């Protein structure tokens, strides 16, 4: 229907219904975007990409620290049917070269801080400089023609490719469809009590599924706000969590940030009373971390998932975190899980 946003484009949906609502606060740069502003920038980026010949099925790589541009690119690609390729900025140039040769993106968008690596990769590129309106990225947005009509997509169309490493060999590209991101938003949104009033502090790398999808995309799906840390620093994170003006209600991390924060001098005096849900995943969480945060009134909600499932699979309620140490929790609402023996046969319940 004309004027109705496609189901996968919740930025456009909220821009129509709550245009003045804060969508993203890029904390260290001071940039804030309402849903209306994020929608306009996303549209301009879609137009800029289309003007460069990108369309359905084409890949666009992004090499950047945490920033709002991750979400601009994700939804701009969605409007074109293109595919986002977030790159791990911790990789060496040869490692990045392998991924780019394998995924064959038509364009590399990179932060100014990775200019040397981007030049060595010798690809068509646009540079982001969050401190300047004269960067190639911002100029491309300013000069962008109107984008084409939104691509007709289904849940099975690819939205992004995320390279993930196993124990051996080169990283392999995990195919992430629009449906996977949508169902993850639903699966996590309900038990994590995510709503339009949710405010999440995002600290995990956005090139990783944990940063993008726990809980950032579910929060944007609900019409809430995400506050992005460019890089995690425990004392600063505790300051943000304590700030009543920010009103942070949700937090997600792997165990290490929780350990770093609880070992920081500011931890005992931090005001954590506004936290509704604090999730932890990505690795087993030590009992000492669970007990310390529970004693501060913040029981950690544990989860299990993997990049290939985008990512949520199971969740263990905070009330059971200490009692059931070592458990991965129960399957999410729209998730089916089998437990099998070494022969692949279902075990008894």
Language-model features, listed with the residues they occupy:
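A short helix-loop-beta submotif of the ANL/AMP-binding
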Residues: 59, 65-85, 89-93, 101-107, ...
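ATP-dependent adenylate-forming carboxylate-activation enzymes
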Residues: 64, 85-98, 112-114, 224-244
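Gly/Ser/Thr-rich phosphate-binding loop
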Residues: 192, 221, 248-253, 262-323, ...
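Conserved AMP-binding/adenylation subdomain of ANL enzymes
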Residues: 182-199, 207-249, 259-260, 264
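ANL superfamily adenylate-forming
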Residues: 113-155
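Conserved pre-ATP/AMP-binding loop-to-beta segment of ANL
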Residues: 20, 144-163, 170, 193-199
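Conserved AMP-binding/adenylate-forming core of the ANL superfamily
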Residues: 23-67, 71-75, 92-97
């Amino acid at each position: 229907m004309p004027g109705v946003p496609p189901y996968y484009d919740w930025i456009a949906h909220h821009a129509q219904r709550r245009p003045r609502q804060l969508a993203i606060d890029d904390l260290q740069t001071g940039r804030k975007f309402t849903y209306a502003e994020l929608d306009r920038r996303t549209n301009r980026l879609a137009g800029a990409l289309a003007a460069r010949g990108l369309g359905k099925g084409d890949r666009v790589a992004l090499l950047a620290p945490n920033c709002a541009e991750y979400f601009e690119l994700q939804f701009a690609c969605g409007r074109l049917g293109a595919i986002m390729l977030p790159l791990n900025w911790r990789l060496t140039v040869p490692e990045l070269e392998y991924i780019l040769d394998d995924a064959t993106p038509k364009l590399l968008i990179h932060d100014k801080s990775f200019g040397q690596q981007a030049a060595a990769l010798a690809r068509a590129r646009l540079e982001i400089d969050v401190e300047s309106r004269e960067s190639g990225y911002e100029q491309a947005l300013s000069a962008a023609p109107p984008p084409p009509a939104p691509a007709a997509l289904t849940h099975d169309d690819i939205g992004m490719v995320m390279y993930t490493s196993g124990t051996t060999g080169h990283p392999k590209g995990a195919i992430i469809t629009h449906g996977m991101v949508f169902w993850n938003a639903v699966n996590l949104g309900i038990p994590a009590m995510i709503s339009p009033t949710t405010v999440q502090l995002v600290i995990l790398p956005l090139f990783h599924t944990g940063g993008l999808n726990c809980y950032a995309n579910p929060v944007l799906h609900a019409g809430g706000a995400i506050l992005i840390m460019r890089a995690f620093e425990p004392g600063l994170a505790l300051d943000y969590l304590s700030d009543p003006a920010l009103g942070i209600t949700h937090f997600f991390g792997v165990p290490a940030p929780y350990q770093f924060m609880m070992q920081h001098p500011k931890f005992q005096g931090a005001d954590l009373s506004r936290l509704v849900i604090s999730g932890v995943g990505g690795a087993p969480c030590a009992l000492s971390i669970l007990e310390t945060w529970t004693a501060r009134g913040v029981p950690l909600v544990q989860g299990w998932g993997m990049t290939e499932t985008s990512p949520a699979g199971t969740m263990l309620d905070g009330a059971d975190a200490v009692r059931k140490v070592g458990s991965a929790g129960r399957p999410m609402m729209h998730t089916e899980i089998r437990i099998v023996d070494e022969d692949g046969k279902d075990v008894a319940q």
